[in-house]
Amino acid sequence: MAIFFVSCPLHFENHLAEEIKSFWFEMMDLDGQPTRQPVPEFEIVPGGIEIKCADHLGYQINFFSKLALRVLIRIHRFTARFYDQFEKEMKALPLDKWIDDKNVAVKIETAKSRLNHERNLIEAATKALSGSGFKLMSKANNKIYIRIVKDNATISLDTSGEHLHKRGYSIFKGDAPIRENLAALMVQQIYHHNKDRHISFIDPFVGSGTTLFETASFFTPNFNRDYAWLQFKNKPKVFNSESWVKNFRWVQNPKNVELTGIDIDQEAIDNLNENSLLFAKTYPEISLQLKTLVADSTELKKEQLASTNKPCWVISNPPYGVRLSQSSVHQAFRHLESLVDLAGAVILHPETLAIDFSDLRLSSQIDFSNQGLKLKLSVFTK
């Protein structure tokens, strides 16, 4: 058993716990079968969740979580009030258990501790690790996270590599793109209200397509990007085979996902179309029915929209401020509602931007801040 810390944006913690519970039994045990191990207890702290579970399950959270930022494995804990004490404990780190590469990066965070000078801590860590042949680099494939709070040090090794919100498909972007994990939180709220996964989605302010791509891939693990733990010396043997992905035969991937993306900016639609090609490489298991339109969403005509037999949801993070007036946003949603029989809508917007519909009613709302801006994630249903 090991202890993992799954980090996420502030105020995502409970949603992350819910997400991990939802995919827990999709993960694989060492015999190549869906795990039979029970969902562990979670310790929820600001910025993430601490979980005690088998190594092979903690590592796989990287594949499945759409809300997490990264997954760390705890490798050492100790009291640190003096630099010689800190250096001695750092020398005892069992890094050779996990990694061969002797180049490592170190990230340090301190709070309410006697040892709080980052440069001195870096020097002490450099001296300690060099004795084991490790070299500290500003950039390295392996990252060590040192957190000292109230003189208690926790040392963790990154298992993710790049931030998990970097799925691999969102390369072409415009102004102020929404992060993938924030778009995924929007999708999670849709499935609170609509248990049927057979839904069509439309975004009248689609930009480079992140909201739509996250709806399509929400239930599909991301096997097609690099993760740090796949290079660990002690990674589970079941992942040594080049065909290990085929073991996840029970994962049900969506087919013929109906998506409509609309934007007044031709460049935004061009970016979306480029990203759709990358999406197909990242998630080859998913087949999309993607329709894009360069159009003003306040002037759409019914014949421009694809007909569907599925419930239709709006998912959107409309531009605001100088890029689009509040009245135009309101008009676009009301106009779309007049053209399509909407089952619901999930809108991410500043708290100063009022959103409403004719027939849909506000069902739930999440308040949070993003880069200092107070936002609301509002869900509307019939």
Language model: regions and residue ranges:
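A short, flexible beta-alpha/helix-coil linker loop
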Residues: A111-S113, H163, Y320-R323
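Catalytic cores of enzyme domains
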Residues: L129-A140, I144-R167, V206
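Residues in the short beta-alpha loop(s) of Rossmann-like NAD(P)-binding domains
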Residues: F12, D265, E351
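Short beta-strand/turn micro-motifs composed of small residues
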Residues: C8, D263, H349
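C-terminal catalytic and target-recognition region of SAM-dependent MTase-like enzymes
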Residues: A295-K382
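Conserved S-adenosyl-L-methionine
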Residues: I178-T298
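SAM-dependent Rossmann-like transferase core, predominantly class I methyltransferases
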Residues: I155-Y191
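Non-catalytic nucleic-acid substrate-recognition regions in nucleic-acid-modifying enzymes
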Residues: A2-A140
